Amino acid sequence: MHAFSKIRLTFNQDSPQSHEDDAAGIAVQDAKPTLQAPPMYKVVLFNDDYTPMDFVVEVLEVFFNLNRELATKVMLAVHTEGRAVCGLFTRDIAETKAMQVNQYARESQHPLLCEIEKDG
Protein backbone atom coordinates (compact mmCIF):
# COMPACT_ATOMS: atom_id res chain seq x y z
CA MET A 1 0.00 0.00 0.00
CA HIS A 2 1.11 3.50 -0.74
CA ALA A 3 1.69 5.94 2.05
CA PHE A 4 -0.94 8.25 0.59
CA SER A 5 -3.73 5.69 0.70
CA LYS A 6 -3.94 5.92 4.50
CA ILE A 7 -4.48 9.71 4.50
CA ARG A 8 -8.06 10.77 5.07
CA LEU A 9 -9.13 14.31 4.19
CA THR A 10 -12.04 15.96 5.92
CA PHE A 11 -13.60 19.09 4.42
CA ASN A 12 -15.55 21.53 6.51
CA GLN A 13 -18.67 22.34 4.51
CA ASP A 14 -20.15 24.71 7.03
CA SER A 15 -20.29 28.37 6.10
CA PRO A 16 -17.54 30.41 7.71
CA GLN A 17 -18.82 32.35 10.69
CA SER A 18 -17.09 34.58 13.11
CA HIS A 19 -17.71 33.54 16.67
CA GLU A 20 -16.85 37.03 17.84
CA ASP A 21 -20.08 38.49 16.34
CA ASP A 22 -22.17 35.81 18.03
CA ALA A 23 -20.58 36.55 21.37
CA ALA A 24 -21.20 40.29 21.09
CA GLY A 25 -24.86 39.82 20.13
CA ILE A 26 -24.61 42.24 17.20
CA ALA A 27 -26.79 41.61 14.19
CA VAL A 28 -25.24 42.81 10.94
CA GLN A 29 -27.29 43.45 7.81
CA ASP A 30 -25.94 44.62 4.48
CA ALA A 31 -27.35 47.94 3.31
CA LYS A 32 -29.51 47.60 0.22
CA PRO A 33 -28.86 50.23 -2.43
CA THR A 34 -31.78 52.46 -3.29
CA LEU A 35 -32.45 52.82 -6.99
CA GLN A 36 -33.86 55.95 -8.54
CA ALA A 37 -35.53 56.32 -11.89
CA PRO A 38 -33.36 58.26 -14.36
CA PRO A 39 -34.46 61.80 -15.20
CA MET A 40 -36.70 61.97 -18.25
CA TYR A 41 -36.44 64.35 -21.20
CA LYS A 42 -39.08 65.59 -23.63
CA VAL A 43 -38.32 65.52 -27.34
CA VAL A 44 -39.91 68.64 -28.83
CA LEU A 45 -40.60 69.52 -32.48
CA PHE A 46 -40.81 73.20 -33.44
CA ASN A 47 -42.94 74.69 -36.19
CA ASP A 48 -41.52 76.51 -39.18
CA ASP A 49 -43.10 77.99 -42.29
CA TYR A 50 -41.35 75.74 -44.80
CA THR A 51 -41.44 72.08 -43.71
CA PRO A 52 -44.40 70.25 -45.30
CA MET A 53 -46.92 68.69 -42.94
CA ASP A 54 -46.54 65.30 -44.62
CA PHE A 55 -42.82 65.34 -43.85
CA VAL A 56 -43.50 66.03 -40.16
CA VAL A 57 -45.97 63.11 -40.07
CA GLU A 58 -43.36 60.88 -41.72
CA VAL A 59 -40.75 61.89 -39.11
CA LEU A 60 -43.16 61.11 -36.28
CA GLU A 61 -44.00 57.71 -37.76
CA VAL A 62 -40.41 56.71 -38.52
CA PHE A 63 -38.48 58.05 -35.52
CA PHE A 64 -41.14 57.91 -32.79
CA ASN A 65 -43.14 54.88 -33.97
CA LEU A 66 -46.43 56.78 -33.90
CA ASN A 67 -49.35 55.54 -35.95
CA ARG A 68 -50.71 57.78 -38.71
CA GLU A 69 -53.57 59.16 -36.60
CA LEU A 70 -51.43 60.09 -33.60
CA ALA A 71 -48.65 61.44 -35.82
CA THR A 72 -51.19 63.69 -37.53
CA LYS A 73 -52.47 64.97 -34.16
CA VAL A 74 -48.93 65.79 -33.00
CA MET A 75 -48.15 67.45 -36.35
CA LEU A 76 -51.27 69.64 -36.02
CA ALA A 77 -50.23 70.59 -32.48
CA VAL A 78 -46.80 71.60 -33.82
CA HIS A 79 -48.49 73.62 -36.57
CA THR A 80 -51.07 75.40 -34.39
CA GLU A 81 -49.16 75.82 -31.12
CA GLY A 82 -45.68 76.30 -32.54
CA ARG A 83 -44.28 73.24 -30.78
CA ALA A 84 -45.29 69.82 -29.47
CA VAL A 85 -43.81 67.00 -27.43
CA CYS A 86 -43.11 63.88 -29.49
CA GLY A 87 -42.12 61.62 -26.62
CA LEU A 88 -40.57 61.25 -23.19
CA PHE A 89 -37.26 59.37 -22.92
CA THR A 90 -34.09 59.04 -20.90
CA ARG A 91 -31.42 61.58 -21.82
CA ASP A 92 -29.34 59.38 -24.15
CA ILE A 93 -32.35 58.19 -26.11
CA ALA A 94 -33.86 61.70 -26.29
CA GLU A 95 -30.58 63.18 -27.57
CA THR A 96 -30.23 60.41 -30.15
CA LYS A 97 -33.78 60.85 -31.45
CA ALA A 98 -33.43 64.64 -31.68
CA MET A 99 -30.11 64.27 -33.53
CA GLN A 100 -31.61 61.72 -35.95
CA VAL A 101 -34.61 63.95 -36.70
CA ASN A 102 -32.43 67.04 -37.25
CA GLN A 103 -30.02 65.12 -39.48
CA TYR A 104 -32.86 63.60 -41.53
CA ALA A 105 -34.50 67.03 -41.91
CA ARG A 106 -31.23 68.59 -43.13
CA GLU A 107 -30.63 65.73 -45.58
CA SER A 108 -34.16 66.29 -46.90
CA GLN A 109 -33.48 70.05 -47.09
CA HIS A 110 -36.12 71.02 -44.51
CA PRO A 111 -35.54 73.46 -41.62
CA LEU A 112 -37.47 71.31 -39.11
CA LEU A 113 -35.99 71.69 -35.62
CA CYS A 114 -36.08 69.08 -32.86
CA GLU A 115 -34.70 69.66 -29.35
CA ILE A 116 -34.84 68.08 -25.91
CA GLU A 117 -36.01 69.59 -22.62
CA LYS A 118 -35.78 68.18 -19.11
CA ASP A 119 -39.16 66.97 -17.89
CA GLY A 120 -40.54 68.52 -14.74
From Swiss-Prot:
GO terms for biological process: protein catabolic process; proteolysis. Signal peptide: none annotated. Gene3D superfamilies: 3.30.1390.10. InterPro entries: ClpS, ClpS_core, Ribosomal_bL12_C/ClpS-like. Binds to the N-terminal domain of the chaperone ClpA. PANTHER family: ATP-DEPENDENT CLP PROTEASE ADAPTER PROTEIN CLPS, ATP-DEPENDENT CLP PROTEASE ADAPTER PROTEIN CLPS1, CHLOROPLASTIC. Involved in the modulation of the specificity of the ClpAP-mediated ATP-dependent protein degradation. Belongs to the ClpS family. This is ATP-dependent Clp protease adapter protein ClpS. It comes from Pseudomonas savastanoi pv. phaseolicola (strain 1448A / Race 6). The gene is clpS.
